[in-house]
């Protein structure tokens, strides 16, 4: 009898554990129809996923011959970062092409006819419809042959993807010659100087890295000369900034780096992506974060939090006052503005303890999705 109860208890605990793991690690296989062809992808929902949050989406494409599961497990695992930074990670699956390769198809003279552009377009629509994802914050990255595909997406889907990231791949010459993006797009590129697959200085098929950077700087109408920052470990970051909408071109050069997915790639890519919407970014002098940079409680935008901010909030509420950032007035971050917000600010000022919801005390973007306007704010 004791053994029976023990087994029952063990089963109950296992069920609880399984439920907890299912809630914290939601990997969902999905399919989508692309012109009569069934395409597969896997969706990772971050912990405590709520469709009301309208999260951004990062599509991650592996190298040639790799399944999405392999890329997720052994190279581009974005799941911990998705939990921490609140985004949905998607791992698309390539099709077996006419040459027997589980490879992504690139547009151009060597195309196998597989519609990868339509695949991305269909996945974006599905993520918006099925998970209420934010259509303004769709991002894609790829490694090796998956990285080569990103150049097609940058050229063909700049009005769908806010930014793309490319690791260990340069543009094919034919991709550049046919590239006419509908609008500027954020570009972040990671490449080693000893990469055998994507030669840093180009070859008969791919363009040199400096030519590629100049091309995208021209597309984004940035400054012609980049800033240069050492990242340590032989890595140097070059950034072309100050284009319209602050669309940036960023290039990480890895001195003596080979054809690999570097360990810093996930964080570097997301740091870049997280600034973007389709309309712009927050990188470079004079640029504000894409969702509107502000400091919660700093209602008058003077860079500090004091009694005048509470007064400004009350004037806004009851006397027709104007503010440049409604999100800054939302002191309790509940997505609405009322007397409770002024009370929250006053409580922080005079209680001597506690804090306000982020972004606070530093300036930043609002991680809470709401209808409050803060896009034209210049307070920080």
Predicted features, each with a name:
Residues 194-198, 259-260:
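Acidic catalytic loop of the alpha/beta-hydrolase fold
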Residues 27-48, 52-139, 148, 152, ...:
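Serine-hydrolase catalytic machinery in alpha/beta-hydrolase-like enzymes
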Residues 282-380:
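Cellulosome-associated attachment modules in secreted, modular CAZymes
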Residues 189-191:
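Short beta-strand/loop motif that positions the catalytic acidic residue
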Residues 21-57, 88, 138-171, 175, ...:
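A domain-start/cap signature at the N-terminus of enzymes
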Residues 265-282:
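Catalytic active-site module of serine/aspartate enzymes centered on a nucleophile-bearing elbow/loop
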């Amino acid at each position: 009898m004791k053994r029976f109860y023990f087994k029952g208890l063990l089963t109950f605990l296992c069920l609880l554990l399984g439920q907890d793991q299912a809630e914290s690690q939601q990997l969902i296989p999905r399919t989508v129809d692309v012109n009569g062809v069934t395409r597969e992808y896997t969706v990772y929902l971050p912990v405590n996923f709520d469709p009301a949050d309208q999260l951004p989406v990062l599509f991650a494409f592996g190298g040639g011959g790799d399944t999405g599961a392999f890329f997720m497990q052994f190279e581009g695992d974005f799941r911990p970062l998705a939990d921490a930074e609140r985004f949905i990670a998607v791992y698309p699956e390539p099709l077996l092409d006419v040459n027997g390769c589980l490879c992504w198809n690139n547009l151009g003279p060597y195309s196998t006819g597989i519609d990868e552009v339509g695949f991305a377009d269909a996945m974006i629509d599905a993520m918006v419809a099925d998970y209420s994802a934010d259509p303004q914050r769709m991002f894609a990255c790829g490694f090796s042959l998956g990285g080569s595909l990103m150049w097609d997406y940058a050229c063909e889907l700049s009005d769908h993807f806010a930014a793309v990231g490319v690791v260990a791949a340069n543009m094919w010459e034919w991709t550049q010659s046919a590239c006419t993006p509908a609008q500027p797009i954020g570009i972040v590129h990671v490449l080693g100087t000893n990469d055998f697959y994507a030669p840093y200085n180009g070859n008969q098929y791919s363009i040199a890295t400096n030519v590629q950077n100049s091309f995208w700087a021209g597309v984004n109408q940035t400054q012609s000369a980049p800033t240069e920052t050492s990242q340590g470990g032989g890595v140097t970051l070059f950034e072309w900034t100050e284009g319209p909408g602050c669309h940036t071109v960023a290039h990480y050069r890895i001195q003596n780096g080979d054809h690999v997915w570097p360990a810093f790639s996930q964080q570097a890519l997301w740091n870049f992506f997280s600034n973007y919407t389709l309309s712009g970014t927050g990188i470079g002098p004079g640029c504000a974060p894409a969702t509107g940079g502000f400091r919660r409680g700093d209602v008058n935008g003077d860079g500090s939090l004091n009694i005048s901010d509470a007064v400004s909030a009350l004037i806004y509420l009851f006397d027709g006052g104007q503010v440049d950032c409604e999100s800054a007035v939302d002191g309790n971050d509940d997505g609405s503005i009322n007397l409770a917000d002024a009370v929250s600010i006053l409580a922080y000022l005079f209680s001597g303890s506690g804090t306000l919801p982020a972004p606070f005390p530093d300036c930043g973007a609002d991680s809470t999705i709401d209808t409050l306007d803060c896009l034209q704010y210049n307070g920080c």
